[in-house]
Design a protein with these regions (language model features):
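A short acidic, Gly/Pro-enriched loop at the edge of an enzyme's catalytic core
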Residues: 201-213
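Conserved beta-strand signature within the Rossmann-like core of class I S-adenosyl-L-methionine
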Residues: 239-247
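Conserved Class I S-adenosyl-L-methionine
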Residues: 170, 255-290
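Surface-exposed recognition segments
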Residues: 1-68
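S-adenosyl-L-methionine
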Residues: 159-201
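A short glycine-rich, Lys/Arg-flanked "PGG" loop and its adjoining helix->strand segment in the class I
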Residues: 226-238
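Conserved SAM/SAH-binding beta-strand->alpha-helix loop
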Residues: 147
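Conserved alpha-helix/loop element of class I SAM-dependent methyltransferases that forms part
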Residues: 95-117
Length: 319
């Protein structure tokens, strides 16, 4: 049978647990002793996990099944960017900085105020924490991201799965971690969410009629952010709320230089992203209040963290 942990299982930070790597859908639990085993594993009632191609038990039993063996991927997500964002969204808080997706979702809900709370969309949702947070307050929430790897994590969590991932400690050393909505108090409203892979600059027509659109740390990662901003009003109901958060870290790897919204000289004057937002959104939106800064921390290794301030602006659709 497949090998997995009990729901209450947790690794101890001090104990070097050698069982967690076997929770990967590649190990089978084999009952009985093994001729190469000593100690507890040699007992008749022992249980231990072995990869299917190991030959320790070749002389004991041979089982042939008519059921095709499905090829399984590792249950532990190891993609560096995905694991960083899993920890960013669902892991521990560092340096007394509150969880960013949760804090931003609460800010967005407050910005909507007494307006309709029917439908919301999180554009650039990554692995989905803000989507689940918004689902506590909206009847339907859609998370859209360009990366299928990110979306897969949100889909698995919404399904009720435990998503296991590793975080880098030092060199090749990693720590095994897991995320589950029930542990965060988010499972009761998970049925309200949907995840879609999509391009914020070229959204399908179905993504319309929202009371709230959240664009978190998105615009400075788009290949044509002005195109997105020119058309975003078409996705919102009249009177709907648009919340944009960004550290404005413009990089040519993500956005061609001629598509940057700000961070350069224009007509001899400093032109900032906020100036561009006001110019591009002014026809259909009114900015509510003043911009505010929301901090976030992304863990890279045990001793290396990114500490960033994201500027948050709130806009109401007026035309």
């Amino acid at each position: 049978s497949l090998h997995d942990a009990l729901p209450i299982f947790e690794t101890h930070p001090i104990y070097d647990d050698f069982t967690t790597p076997t929770f990967d859908d590649r190990h089978n639990l084999i009952k009985g002793g093994s001729w190469v085993s000593t100690g507890n594993e040699a007992e008749p009632e022992s249980r231990y996990a072995f990869r299917r191609h190991f030959f320790q038990h070749a002389g004991f039993r041979y089982v042939l099944t008519d059921t095709p063996v499905a090829s399984q991927t590792s249950r532990y997500e190891a993609d560096e960017l995905v694991t960083q964002y899993m920890e960013f969204h669902y892991g521990a808080e560092y340096w007394d900085v509150p969880n960013f997706p949760r804090a931003l979702a609460r800010l967005a809900v407050d910005a909507v105020g007494h307006g309709p709370h029917r439908r919301a969309m999180d554009l650039g949702c990554a692995v989905g924490r803000a989507v689940f947070e918004l689902a506590r307050h909206f009847d339907e929430v859609v998370g859209v991201d360009f990366s299928a790897r990110f979306i897969d994590q949100g889909v698995a969590l919404a399904r009720g799965d435990t998503v296991r991932y590793t975080v880098a400690e030092e060199g090749e050393l990693v720590q095994y971690k897991a995320a589950k909505l029930a542990d965060l108090g988010l499972s009761d409203t998970a049925a309200r969410v949907q995840f879609w892979q999509g391009d914020a600059c070229n959204l399908k027509p179905q993504f319309t009629g929202y009371d709230l659109i959240l664009a978190a740390n998105l615009i400075d990662r788009l290949y044509d952010p002005a195109r997105f901003l020119h058309g975003v009003h078409e996705r919102l109901n009249m009177g709907g709320t648009l919340v944009i958060a960004s550290p404005y870290t413009w990089l040519v790897e993500h956005t061609p230089r001629d598509k940057w919204l700000g961070g350069f000289k224009k007509d001899g004057e400093s032109w900032r992203t906020l100036d561009a937002l006001k110019a591009l959104l002014g026809t259909h939106f009114q900015m509510v209040g003043q911009p505010r800064e929301l901090p976030f921390v992304i863990r890279e290794t045990q001793h290396k963290f990114q500490h960033t301030l994201s500027e948050v602006t709130v806009w109401k659709r007026t035309h």
